[in-house]
Regions:
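Non-catalytic alpha-helical scaffolds and adjoining flexible linkers that form interface surfaces
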Residues: 21-46, 51-271
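Hydrophobic, Leu/Ile/Phe/Ala-enriched alpha-helical segments that form helix-helix packing faces
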Residues: 1-2, 250
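Intrinsically disordered, low-complexity proline-rich regions
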Residues: 3, 13-19
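Acidic/polar hotspots within intrinsically disordered regions
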Residues: 5-8
C-alpha cells in the first residue's frame, strides 16, 4: 500500500510520513480588550488576564512595561483592571499564554481611576465578570455590553453610579444563560433565587426575595439604559441587602463562585 505524507492537512501519496504534528504559527491580530487582572512577572514584565472582543478570555505576557528606562516608564499603567485597550497580539489558540505586540488606550476614562467610589463599583464589575468567564470563547455581545457599561459608569452621575452594581449584576447573567425571568406581578410577587423566576408562594428554602426587594428587582430588570437608574431611589441599607441577595443568586448558579472580595468595600462606599 503506498505511503502518504501530510502537508498542511493534504496527504501526498508516496511521501514519507512525518512523526511530528503540524505546528500552528503565531499570527498577529488586532482586537479590543478589557483588562481583568494583572500580575507582576520577573523584574520588568506583567502577566495580564484580558477579556478580548475576538478571542474571549485570554492571558498575555507583556514584556518590559515595568522597566525603569524611559521606554518603559508609565506603560504598566495601561494594564490597570477595567482599562479598555486596542491591542495587537500574537495569537495561537494552542497556547495558554500569548504575547502582546502593541497596545494603546481605546478609551481613556475621566473618573474611574481617580474617583474612589466609582473605582470600587468598577472593580466589583470586573470581579463579577471574571468569576463568570470560564473558557476562552469569543462573545462579542458580552464584550459590547461590558464596554458600554464601563464607559457609562465613568460618565454617570452619583445617583446612577449608586445603582450601577445592581444593574450590572442583574443583566450580566443574560449572557451566561441564567437571567432572572421578569414575570413579577401581584399574583407572583416572590422571587425564587434558586429557580430564577417569580412565584405566587414562598419556596421551602431561604433563597428568595419578597416585598419591596422583589418589586425593585423587577424594576431593575426592565431597565435597558443606565440613565434610567436615576429614577430608582434607594437607601444604602436597601442596596446592601440587594447586593447580598444577588451574590447569593450567582453562588446558586455558578459552580465554585466563592465570595466576592470587592463587595464589603462597595457596601461601605455606596450611599
Amino acid at each position: 500500500m503506498p505511503r502518504r505524507h501530510e502537508i498542511h492537512g493534504v496527504y501526498i501519496p508516496g511521501s514519507p510520513v512525518s512523526p511530528w504534528p503540524t505546528i500552528m504559527p503565531d499570527r498577529t491580530q488586532k482586537t479590543k480588550g478589557i483588562v481583568l487582572r494583572t500580575v507582576k512577572y520577573g523584574e520588568t514584565s506583567l502577566i495580564v488576564s484580558i477579556f478580548t472582543e475576538l478571542f474571549g478570555l485570554q492571558s498575555y505576557m507583556v514584556s518590559g512595561v515595568r522597566a525603569s528606562t524611559k521606554k518603559g516608564t508609565g506603560k504598566a499603567n495601561l494594564f490597570q483592571p477595567t482599562a479598555i485597550l486596542d491591542l495587537v497580539v500574537y495569537h495561537n489558540e494552542l497556547k495558554h499564554l500569548n504575547r502582546i505586540k502593541e497596545f494603546k488606550w481605546h478609551h481613556l476614562y475621566k473618573n474611574i481611576f481617580s474617583d474612589v467610589p466609582r473605582n470600587a463599583v468598577a472593580l466589583f464589575m470586573i470581579e463579577l465578570l471574571t468569576k463568570c468567564l470560564k473558557q476562552p470563547e469569543p462573545n462579542p455581545e458580552l464584550f459590547e455590553f461590558c464596554e458600554d457599561a464601563f464607559i457609562h459608569l465613568d460618565e454617570s452621575s452619583e445617583a446612577i453610579m449608586a445603582n450601577f452594581p445592581l444593574f450590572f449584576a442583574l443583566h450580566l447573567p443574560a449572557f451566561f444563560g441564567f437571567r432572572i425571568s421578569d414575570d413579577y406581578s401581584e399574583e407572583t410577587p416572590v422571587l425564587d433565587l434558586q429557580e430564577g423566576t417569580f412565584f405566587a408562594d414562598k419556596p421551602d428554602y431561604l433563597h428568595f426575595l419578597e416585598g419591596k426587594q422583589a418589586e425593585i428587582t423587577s424594576e431593575l430588570l426592565k431597565i435597558m439604559q443606565p440613565e434610567e437608574l436615576a429614577q430608582i431611589k434607594l437607601n444604602q441599607d436597601f442596596r446592601r441587602q440587594l447586593l447580598h441577595a444577588y451574590e447569593t443568586y450567582y453562588r446558586l448558579h455558578i459552580q465554585d463562585f466563592g465570595t466576592m472580595k470587592t463587595l464589603p468595600v462597595l457596601r461601605e462606599l455606596l450611599g
